[in-house]
Amino acid sequence: REVEEGSVVVLCGKGNNGGDGWVAADYLAAQGVEVAVVAPVEPSLIRGDAARDAAKRACSVGIPVHVAPDYEELVALLVEADVVVDAVFGTGFHGVMPEPFDMWVEAVDDYFEGMVFSVDVPSGIDATTGQAEGPYFQADTTLTMFALKPGLIAGLGKQAAGQLVVASLVGDDEGSEELADSAR
């Protein structure tokens, strides 16, 4: 769905999937979309050079960053947003979603009424089995890289992923354009 004059909250994890979220935030801001990032740690503490560099780049262009917000602060951001980007966990996730991310899922479930856009796989869903051992994001659209993951077409993943978009990452702006269109 397209949102006129929309705003986006990007929920970023500490690893590579979070790095994808920082890149998405930077891309959206460059397109004139109002965007804010929620992160569990300061950008300098993000794991992986590429993810940390993406976070630093997003911060350098003035994207608002909310580090480890409490529940009320997160809810305040969510009720004003039109789109949430779930870039918390990716294909390597297994098990139960740890704190504070379980609280992020709860806040989105309870207070967010817009579109949820997951990066690679809805966080909380096992990309191999499609199962969840705890809370998970219910996406309207999931942008997955290169190919469908088995967990996106099996178990809870089949329902949690929403509409699936496969991006090649090489000269393929389909996913980026769809995300930007969702926020306009």
Task: Please provide the spans of the model-predicted regions.
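N-terminal small/polar loop signature for handling phosphorylated ligands or for N-terminal nucleophile
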Residues: 9, 23-101, 105-109
